[in-house]
Amino acid sequence: MKIVVLAGGISTERDVSLVTGKNVYNALCTKGHQVILLDVYLGYEGEVQNIFEQDIDWIAQVGSISEESPDLEAVKAMRKDGDKNFFGPNVLTICQESDVVFMALHGECGEDGKIQAAFDLFGIRYTGTDPTSSAICMDKAITKDLFKAYGISTPKGVHFTKENPIMEPVALPCVVKACCGGSSVGVTIANTKEEYQTAVKDTFRYGDKIVVEQYIKGREFSVGVIDGRALPVIEIAPLCGFYDYKNKYQAGSTVETCPAEIPQEATEGMQKCAEEAYRALRLKNYARMDFMMDAEGKYYCLEANTLPGMTSTSLLPQEAAAVGISFEDLCQKIVDMAV
């Protein structure tokens, strides 16, 4: 098949997306496909005729993930055409020539449904879920509201906008999150009123809406779901702090155990909850649900990831490997579900 792996963009998760794209590109090449790795924002300014037959080093632009989120203004300055269009030069043209686009994007303008909606209008096939469910899952406030409506256990919380902020914490400690952020960018644990107020001000740098929820002290887990079926539970134990941007993507920053060493009842309960969340949010193809478990063994579903990371340290590939699915086969399975 002719496959475009679409990565990059201008979200705070740009670097992660590029490394996901590189890994997926290599895996699909191994499977014998004609594959292009394309930055959705920077595009490709060369000759596009017979683009899939050209001998181009598509991964030359991809580097390692830094400990901090990327300088997006510097990325925007790299755009030679100066166009305000989100899609870089020839992106839509190249995607229309493909059999399917593998969505290796993360964060805003990737996981939020906007690109999916554009692709639907252009008749372009893509991996992952549809525009509506993508947009819902990108908004943590709406996701939590749906979890509550479907009886899915989730931490208590409130959400508010920059126009009407809640500057007095409802309860402490609490977690302050950018409503539409990802990779734990814009996430702070506040233990005091002063920390809370500082966190609210800082988090508004990442968007106009914030979610504040009760802090669940305990163990962190994740459960991938492929085509409605849960994978093994994985436990994530950061060596320092919580599972933030640095701990997620710097090798050696966390200890991950899959299958998680927890009672079978807890494993089955979390897997069932992940599948229920998948159905409640109307997800398609694949996703990953994040959980916390308190000292009493009660688990809470935090959020859904519609385009989980596929880097060397990412959780979904580790979960798939635990049931004998190689990274290459996982990528192929995701493609097969989309076509």
Predicted regions and their residues:
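ATP-binding N-terminal substructure of ATP-dependent carboxylate-amine bond-forming enzymes
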Residues: 1-132, 136-138, 142, 149, ...
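Glycine-rich phosphate/pyrophosphate-binding beta-alpha loops
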Residues: 107, 184, 239, 305-319
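Hydrophobic beta-strand scaffold residues
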Residues: 35, 125-126, 154, 174, ...
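Active-site nucleotide/adenylate-binding loops and adjacent lid/helix of ATP-dependent enzymes
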Residues: 3-7, 11, 15, 19, ...
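Phosphate-binding site of ATP-dependent enzymes
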Residues: 191-272, 293-300
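Cysteine/selenocysteine-centered motifs that mediate thiol-based redox chemistry or coordinate metal-sulfur cofactors
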Residues: 330-339
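Conserved metal-phosphate-binding beta-hairpin within the catalytic cores
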Residues: 214, 223-225, 278-310, 320
